[in-house]
Amino acid sequence: MNHSNQMHHDNHASHDHHSGHAHHHGNFKVKFFVSLIFAIPIILLSPLMGVNLPFQFTFPGSEWVVLILSTILFFYGGKPFLSGGKDEIATKKPGMMTLVALGISVAYIYSLYAFYMNNFSSATGHTMDFFWELATLILIMLLGHWIEMNAVGNAGDALKKMAELLPNSAIKVMDNGQREEVKISDIMTDDIVEVKAGESIPTDGIIVQGQTSIDESLVTGESKKVQKNQNDNVIGGSINGSGTIQVKVTAVGEDGYLSQVMGLVNQAQNDKSSAELLSDKVAGYLFYFAVSVGVISFIVWMLIQNDVDFALERLVTVLVIACPHALGLAIPLVTARSTSIGAHNGLIIKNRESVEIAQHIDYVMMDKTGTLTEGNFSVNHYESFKNDLSNDTILSLFASLESQSNHPLAISIVDFAKSKNVSFTNPQDVNNIPGVGLEGLIDNKTYKITNVSYLDKHKLNYDDDLFTKLAQQGNSISYLIEDQQVIGMIAQGDQIKESSKQMVADLLSRNITPVMLTGDNNEVAHAVAKELGISDVHAQLMPEDKESIIKDYQSDGNKVMMVGDGINDAPSLIRADIGIAIGAGTDVAVDSGDIILVKSNPSDIIHFLTLSNNTMRKMVQNLWWGAGYNIVAVPLAAGILAFIGLILSPAIGAILMSLSTIIVAINAFTLKLK
């Protein structure tokens, strides 16, 4: 199977709000041009009211040609609207298609009556038909829908581009070393594929041979090329920049990064937010409003003028000018655009409600390590406090216990011990002490690695001056305990991310208060916070403390956004009004988090808030346009200003209706991230 085409198809079909529209109505472009062939002679052979031409196209029997061509046009060109109206009524959700179907049906049926009266009745006088209005009406509707479908398609353009990134085939390295080109669908997990410079990486995987720079701009929005070496992860769909590499496949098909992103975005687009449910409800009421106004205007004009032609024209114009569709598409089109732009830039919107809530956020709470800082620790100091143990022995004991952990602090210690050629052993019975550290057996002795809070809580002695000095330098400090005695310590420094300071400044400029939550000691937390400009700091926290702090802030009616690790901070992310999982990488399917930030870049927090602001502004613009248009257009179509000579024909009504939807679509398409 061609993954690219399949994903593209799945994405397109997911535009649920409009897919029915596209589904029943075939190719509007073809229908428009075929209908144009029928419409031209209908218009030329019909008497154009108020237009005096120096020549006539009519001939004896031409009215029969008009009747036949109009009938063909009604059933062929009008079929999308007739079948669409039928489906809307069947689902008990009458809307734009039903209004258009009613309008063209009234025009056609009355024209049949007029044809009979003019050709077979003994009644004197001429009854005006609506054949040329019918022709122009159907033509304009088809043209409008053709343009609209293009605009709707473009709304999710960024996501479509992502869907097309995967190649159709890959070079598989066989067990005997031979290379063979195979379809993407034939690639399995653990296969080895070879990717040359300039080629698209076919699947997610790990580099097992070679090194290169990868262009991930179309996949995650990362503008700079990323250097990749052996054992580094690569994402399917990114471009191999400089060298030939061999990649061991780790995920294929639906498990791949791009497929996961497409699935999450499709799900988000199909879920309706509260604002969209409201607009759908209003759009539903608009149908009944338009029909009521149309019928009332027909009755009123019959009473005023006793002119069935004019009264009927008002009815048809009201039916075709009303556009619940503009209101119904106001939010889905913006959503399709914003979610696809977000995905294209590494911002995966899982919960659409969070885009609306983001406008009201009061606090952004952030974990320190990995969110505000790099999380790449370096050992700056280690020391033994026991005379019979050397500094390197203390380092060995630390490394032995930490070798069983994947925490950034632990990885840093193990790597440092290796770089110093300090040997360490495999401990036994290693257990995690939540919010504190580790404990385990080494040579039948129990050791614990703890933080300073543990020492204070258990009243264990330590060098307070040394701790203060190292902590104020921004070091995270861990202690080694044997038999309730502190026998050693290690201090590790972390770098503040380049974009963290600007992110904090941007939050403050938006009147949003940044809050640091960390399990680290007070001195380190405040040192980092001071450098970043954060005044609200909570340090030495246990994992469950973060959730309770968020709850406390919310109890005063504040809206809280939490940014942290999608796994370790899961309870906090769920508790917050908006949970943002940062640095998810290819694991975008993390359960917690309303928003997934693929990269570990604090700037993306601001990018999300900006995208949210821009999205809501476009939604409001579209809703005002969709509602305002109908409030003005429907009374005009009914003839409320006829006394000053302002009368809209059905054709003008059709043009305005089509334009109203096209304007909504184009406005959605102009949504940008920045």
Swiss-Prot record:
A Pfam family recorded for this sequence: Hydrolase
InterPro entries linked: ATPase_P-typ_cyto_dom_N (IPR023299), ATPase_P-typ_P_site (IPR018303), ATPase_P-typ_TM_dom_sf (IPR023298), ATPase_P-typ_transduc_dom_A_sf (IPR008250), HAD-like_sf (IPR036412), HAD_sf (IPR023214), P-typ_ATPase_IB (IPR027256), P_typ_ATPase (IPR001757)
Catalytic residue list: D367
GO biological process, one term: copper ion homeostasis
CDD domains: P-type_ATPase_Cu-like
EC number(s) from the headed UniProt entry: 7.2.2.8
Chain segments annotated as transmembrane: 32-52, 57-77, 95-115, 127-147, 284-304, 315-335, 623-645, 649-671
Lineage: superkingdom: Bacteria
Entries under PROSITE patterns matching the protein: ATPASE_E1_E2
GO terms of molecular function: ATP binding; ATP hydrolysis activity; copper ion binding; P-type divalent copper transporter activity; P-type monovalent copper transporter activity
Region (Disordered): 1-22
Chief location bin: membrane
Localization (cell): Cell membrane
Segments of skewed composition (Basic and acidic residues): 7-19
Job of this protein: Involved in copper transport.
NCBIfam families: ATPase-IB1_Cu, ATPase-IB_hvy, ATPase_P-type
Protein name per UniProt: Probable copper-transporting P-type ATPase B
